[in-house]
Amino acid sequence: MDYLPIFMKIEQQHCLIVGGGTVAARKADLFIKSGAIVTVVAPKLGNEMTFHLAQGKIIWHMNTFSTALVSELPRPSLVISATDDQNVNLAVYKTYHAQDIPVNVADQTEYCDFILPAIVDRSPMTIAISTGGRSPVLARVMKARLETMIPHGFSVLTDLVGRYRQTVKNVISDIDGRKTFWETLLSGLFIDKAVHGNTGEAEALLEAELETIKNNGQSLPQGEVYIIGAGPGDPDLMTFKGLRLLQQADVILYDRLVAPEILEMGRREAERIYVGKKEKWHKMDQKDINQMLVDLARQGKRVARLKGGDPYIFGRGAEEVELLVQHDVPYQVVPGITAAAGCSVYADFPLTHRDYAQSVALITGHQQAGAQGIDYARLAQSGDTMVFYMGIKNAPKIQAGLIAHGLCPDTPAAIIENGTRLNQKVTVTSLAKLSETIQKKSIKPPALLVIGEVIKVRERLQKKSLLDDRVPA
């Protein structure tokens, strides 16, 4: 390592900033947030530094830095020079470096005893990223990625854990025991309660665990289930929360609509169980899947149930949750981008457009025996954009039903195969030719049927879409 990563406590310590511009103001802001007494030496101040002065957060010496000025300034713990004058910057470095006071000259690593990293601030948690001064831009790129991955609620979580640290130490005397306790707690429901502001519930979980340890001498493993919407196929469309929960799961249950790349995002050591279904062939009955979730959670395991699209849109997620509730199994449901939303965008047309459609109907094309049939009369007269899930097999019935109830046979229809994936294929036809097109092109599931005038917009949008370089039309 070129630099030792270290966090310094500078509260109520004097720190010196030489320079009054934008860069200097941003450095001063870090000192201010850390509670330092900040002195600024500059002949004039920019807008940001003037704001700090107006807030009473800095002490300003309206001078150009010189060695003669040093005796008038309090001895600083840290010094940053951020001016456009290289002679001034060099003078600052030589003056304070000779006194064994750490100095940083902005953008000149050869004159830096310390460097300031890119920071992800979740105070009291702080994450620092450094490239050793080689590429501040790369450090900022990494910071941006971490900002999206780490919820702001981690500040609440960190504070909560800190408040209970001594309490846990009083109950669990050995270090290994405390380590196990915190590792278990911080990979389960507790962390999500705290991060999302449910501190009361988080504290109740923590205290219940401690009470169990007091009474039994050990904490009983408590499993939980995550019903995660994996989105329509493209791994980049997975939500951050879904990814975070997937990566802490001990067991992953998945179906055929989940992309292999998404499955690979789970922990390498996690057990993977395929529970997918195909028409006329079911790997596992839905009731058995529901019970498996309960059984695995009762073994103390964290179970991720990955479902294509969104769990509550033709995903039978509610059936799984009902049984979890009946058995008092803790669970979370993570929404996913449903196929209708994702596939239409990747096929270069919207689902609504004020010139064509003001509403959308999501319809299952696979009807359960005994279920109420599709209301073709309402759909044909509604003006909705119609999206049929699992509708390939029943396309002839869908086509006939809509035409019989008055929908124009020339209404555009789109068939999206493997939507949002690299092998996506979009076929545009008319309602009158829908079944013929599916048969002629040997189209197989997974595929989405979209019927509506809004598909006409595709020709205009497709000309400039960056997605055209990613997926074939």
UniProtKB/Swiss-Prot annotation:
Keyword NAD attributed: yes
Residues that bind S-adenosyl-L-methionine: P232, G308, G309, D310, I313, T338, A339, M390, G419
Similarity-based family: In the N-terminal section; belongs to the precorrin-2 dehydrogenase / sirohydrochlorin ferrochelatase family. In the C-terminal section; belongs to the precorrin methyltransferase family.
EC code: 2.1.1.107, 1.3.1.76, 4.99.1.4
Domain of life: Bacteria
Chain residue ranges for the region called Precorrin-2 dehydrogenase /sirohydrochlorin ferrochelatase: 1-206
Active-site residues annotated for this sequence: D255, K277
GO function terms (MF aspect): NAD binding; precorrin-2 dehydrogenase activity; sirohydrochlorin ferrochelatase activity; uroporphyrin-III C-methyltransferase activity
Name listed for the protein in its UniProt record: Siroheme synthase
GO biological process, any: cobalamin biosynthetic process
Species per Swiss-Prot/TrEMBL record: Hydrogenovibrio crunogenus (strain DSM 25203 / XCL-2) (Thiomicrospira crunogena)
Entry function: Then it catalyzes the NAD-dependent ring dehydrogenation of precorrin-2 to yield sirohydrochlorin. Finally, it catalyzes the ferrochelation of sirohydrochlorin to yield siroheme.
UniProt keyword list: Cobalamin biosynthesis, Lyase, Methyltransferase, Multifunctional enzyme, NAD, Oxidoreductase, Porphyrin biosynthesis, S-adenosyl-L-methionine, Transferase
Pathways involved: Cofactor biosynthesis; adenosylcobalamin biosynthesis; precorrin-2 from uroporphyrinogen III: step 1/1; Cofactor biosynthesis; adenosylcobalamin biosynthesis; sirohydrochlorin from precorrin-2: step 1/1; Porphyrin-containing compound metabolism; siroheme biosynthesis; precorrin-2 from uroporphyrinogen III: step 1/1; Porphyrin-containing compound metabolism; siroheme biosynthesis; siroheme from sirohydrochlorin: step 1/1
CDD domains per record: SUMT
Gene (name only): cysG
Binding site for NAD(+): T22, V23, P43, K44
UniProt-listed SUPFAM superfamilies: NAD(P)-binding Rossmann-fold domains, Siroheme synthase middle domains-like, Tetrapyrrole methylase
Residue segments, region Uroporphyrinogen-III C-methyltransferase: 223-473
